[in-house]
């Protein structure tokens, strides 16, 4: 690849006697949407956690956008995640007592932005995801698809280099799932954000540019994906 944003080399990771990763090499191209697939217990979540700097591998290296994450302390990795990485989870993990605007603004406030600037950017991202009329509502008053779009806006408001999406539509019905995936991929492709998408669902993976499959701690394939 001409311009990889993530280069992982020789990753191993064990939890007690269990080898979760057994020497994985992987590159992710800048602006690519990569689907990481695999059965439960295959090591796919451990791989992605290493790529995102959430955990350190036992051996090997991860270079993200020019920074060797494996050479950093936990506090330094946390700073990189705040500034350059976005996360979307299956159940959104929004704060229920905050409005949509406040949820989206939170990462900017944590990074030291003023309340006014953070709210302005939060509202702009809600608008981009078709949620301008939900800005003052709490997550509990929204549909599941709307709440997940708020979570996507929160993940993208800092303009991360890489978005890690862990089963982002796993809790939604098929119609909502397609709507949310379509909205997410539209905005990330416009902004050039790289996406690493963890999924067990082939239809979700079909939205990606490429798929890799993790089995027993090893990569078993890398395939171009054709949207359904």
Sequence positions of predicted segments:
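H-loop (His-switch) and adjacent beta-strand-loop-beta switch element
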Residues: 211-223
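ABC family nucleotide-binding domain
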Residues: 4-214
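ABC-family P-loop ATPase nucleotide-binding domain
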Residues: 1-12, 220-228
């Amino acid at each position: 690849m001409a311009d990889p944003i993530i280069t992982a080399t020789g990753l191993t990771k064990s939890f007690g006697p269990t080898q979760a990763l057994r020497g994985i090499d992987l590159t992710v191209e800048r602006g690519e949407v990569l689907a990481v697939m695999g059965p439960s217990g295959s090591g796919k979540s451990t791989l992605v956690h290493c790529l995102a700097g959430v955990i350190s591998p036992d051996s090997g290296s991860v270079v993200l956008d020019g920074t060797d994450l494996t050479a950093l302390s936990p506090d330094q990795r946390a700073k990189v995640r705040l500034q350059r990485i976005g996360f979307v989870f299956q159940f959104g993990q929004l704060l229920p007592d905050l409005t949509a605007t406040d949820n989206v603004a939170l990462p900017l406030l944590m990074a030291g932005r003023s309340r006014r600037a953070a709210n302005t950017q939060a509202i702009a991202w809600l608008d981009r995801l078709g949620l301008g009329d939900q800005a003052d509502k709490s997550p509990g008053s929204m549909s599941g698809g709307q709440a997940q779009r708020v979570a996507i806006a929160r993940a993208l408001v800092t303009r991360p280099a890489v978005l890690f999406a862990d089963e982002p539509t796993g809790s939604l019905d098929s119609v909502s799932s397609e709507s949310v995936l379509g909205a997410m991929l539209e905005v990330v492709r416009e902004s050039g954000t790289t996406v690493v998408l963890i999924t067990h669902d082939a239809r979700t993976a079909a939205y990606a540019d490429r798929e890799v499959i993790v089995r027993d701690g090893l990569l078993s394939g890398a395939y171009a994906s054709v949207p359904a």
